[in-house]
Design a protein with these regions (language model features):
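Conserved HxN/HPN-centered segment at the entrance to the catalytic loop
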Residues: 320-328
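Protein kinase catalytic-loop region centered on the HRD/HxD motif
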Residues: 373-383
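Conserved short submotifs of the Hanks-type protein kinase catalytic core
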Residues: 334-348, 352
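Conserved short alpha-helix within the protein kinase catalytic core
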Residues: 361-372
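Regulatory activation segment
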Residues: 415-426
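PP2C/PPM-type serine/threonine phosphatase catalytic domain
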Residues: 1-291, 297-311, 318-320, 332-338, ...
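C-terminal lobe helix-coil module of Hanks-type protein kinase domains
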Residues: 430-530
Length: 567
């Protein structure tokens, strides 16, 4: 069994000298897979003292983050997931503020927020306002956040505006780290020496938090007081923070023969095999046909390969799109390491391209559009396929296109928990975006590049850069790539579509379209920019009118010249 993140937390809050409690705090320290893939959340908020809605605002800010964060996709990064929850909560608070006190934020749903999400070997800090997160360093408290205060007033807070600037910071964790989250009623009156002394007296972190609150009161605090003391007891083993236990524990089953069963799936016949896996047609307990995938024996002793195999099934179970191969339901817990998906009768796009060497523009556009729809489903979950090529696209008898094979998928949230799981360079050089080879930033635009290569190949039978991409080793090499136009006497590709392909295939990712939808639109009709740059002259659009105009001008010039000569 691998080591997981282990945390200890103590909390205490007191109304103090104020007539009502306007602070709120909360935390959730999950276990198992949820801890590995989402992490632990610790947060506190301080409502502004001038508002009768301060407590509600603080409670909403903390409560929404602690609960709604865990409802976001596991594939999202912490910054995306927590950032969207905080932004949505802020919009709700701002809406309430406008309803009860339009133009007067001092009486609105306004509060501070300071939160930590601890995932893997990192902590993510989210901060708005003048609450504080600090780390104990010797006998000192190292502030990890800055106060958003100007002229004694909050310059940034939840509920003041529909748009919110969130301070986000990532810091590495070490076993033994101690963090202190406080509202201003506490941190203005206690020191690192106070925290260190309290920790030396007791191992009870709740008692430590209570002691700090009591000290602040004794030293004259007249505000509400909240303190959270968080200690990192152990860090997860490197590279095993997510998907590690199941991949390590489950045995690789022996290759089954027709008629044999694995967890209720009855094997019918082999479908395909490769160096990584063997795929069988099987019958599920409900009678439906499924594809049963078993890892090859070569990966049995490779922990990373086992985790990546399991990640394929993990990805399939988190995408809901008619253009992405779906995972099939499991009748119960797995007894062995395998994956199971829907069975689709069809051909790969590679075979389809062989059978249709000269597709119409509409046929090519239809396939590209469906692949793009599947990619968008992945990208919305912060996943990059990384191996889009004709062999990994399936077309069934009805013409529905599906993306298959998730062995190279990069999942931002999993990579965050398990650095290095993404492994070696994915994909096939002919379809690999040059940034993978040059070390440039990889993003969803890398998938768009591969899709554009496929579109180009369907329409021309060629590759836009030939074998040039395989020789890229630096940014300089990347920018030297020379695009080969798709327009020639053998293709029916119009100039405006060639420009659309060239843009999606630009060596610089930032010069490619800003969205897949923009790329698709540019394949259907000339872009406004292209039309402006290639507006046909009158002589080409209406030769008769052009020459009539020229003749009229020449006649007028002749009359003027004759008049001058006659005079």
């Amino acid at each position: 069994m691998t080591q997981s993140l282990h945390l200890s937390l103590g909390q205490h809050a007191r109304q103090g000298m104020k007539p009502q409690m306007q602070d709120f705090h909360g935390a959730l320290l999950p276990e198992g897979g949820q801890l590995a893939l989402k992490g632990a959340v610790v947060a506190l908020a301080d409502g502004i003292s001038t508002s009768p809605h301060a407590r509600t605002a603080a409670e909403m800010a903390v409560g929404a983050l602690v609960t709604d964060y865990y409802d976001t996709p596991e594939s999202w990064t912490v910054q995306t997931a927590a950032g969207r929850v905080i932004a949505a909560t802020n919009r709700w608070l701002y809406g309430q503020s406008r309803a009860v006190a339009p133009g007067d934020p001092d009486r609105g749903f306004v509060c501070t927020l300071s939160a930590m999400v601890l995932k893997g070997c990192e902590a993510h800090l989210f901060h708005i306002g003048d609450s504080r997160i600090a780390r104990l360093a010797g006998d000192s408290l190292e502030p990890l956040t800055e106060n958003h205060v100007s002229g004694g007033l909050l310059s940034r807070a939840m509920g003041i505006s529909a748009e919110l600037r969130i301070n986000h910071r990532r810091i590495p964790l070490q076993a033994g780290d101690v963090f202190l989250l406080t509202t201003d009623g506490v941190h203005a009156h206690v020191t690192g020496r106070d925290l260190r002394a309290a920790l030396e007296r007791t191992a009870d972190l709740d008692a430590v938090a209570e002691h700090l609150v009591g000290l602040a009161l004794q030293r004259g605090s007249r505000d509400n007081l909240t303190a959270q003391v968080l200690r990192v007891d152990a860090l997860p083993d490197p590279g095993t923070a997510a998907l590690g236990d199941e991949a390590a524990v489950l045995p690789v089953p022996p290759l089954p023969k027709p008629g044999q069963e694995i967890d209720g799936f009855r094997v019918l016949r082999p479908l395909h095999h490769s160096a990584r896996s063997h795929v069988f047609l099987a019958e599920a307990p409900d009678g439906s046909k499924v594809a049963l995938k078993i890892p090859a024996s070569e990966i049995v002793e490779d922990p990373e390969a086992r985790r990546r195999f399991l990640l394929e099934d993990w990805v399939a179970r988190r995408i809901d799109s008619p253009h992405v191969l779906r995972a099939a339901p499991l009748p119960g817990p797995r007894s062995a390491l395998y994956g199971v998906t829907e069975f689709v009768e069809g051909v790969t796009l590679r075979q389809w391209m062989t059978d249709h060497p000269k597709p119409s523009l509409d046929e090519a556009r239809g396939i590209v559009t469906q692949v793009a729809d599947g990619l968008r489903a992945l990208h919305r979950r912060e996943m990059i396929h990384q191996d889009i090529r004709p062999e990994n696209i399936l077309i069934d008898a009805s013409g529905t296109v599906r993306i298959i094979d998730f062995g190279s998928v990069a999942v931002a949230g999993v990579e965050e928990a398990t650095p290095g799981l993404m492994g070696a360079l994915p994909g096939t050089y002919q379809y690999t975006a040059p940034e993978y080879l040059s070390g440039d930033v990889v993003s969803w635009r890398s998938d768009m590049f591969a899709l554009a290569v496929i579109a180009y190949e369907m329409l021309t039978g060629l590759l836009p850069y030939g074998t040039q991409v395989a020789r890229v080793a630096s940014r300089r090499d990347q920018m030297r790539l020379v695009y080969r136009s798709a327009c020639d006497e053998k293709s029916a590709v119009p100039l405006w579509m060639d420009e659309a392909l060239a843009r999606a295939l630009h060596p610089d990712p930032l010069r490619r379209p800003d969205a897949l939808s923009e790329f698709l639109a540019s394949l259907r009709r000339p872009s406004p920019g292209w039309q402006a740059a290639h507006r046909r002259p009158l002589a080409a659009r209406n030769p008769l009118r052009f020459w009539q105009g020229v003749s009229a001008i020449l006649a007028a010039l002749c009359l003027i010249l004759a008049a001058q000569l006659g005079g």
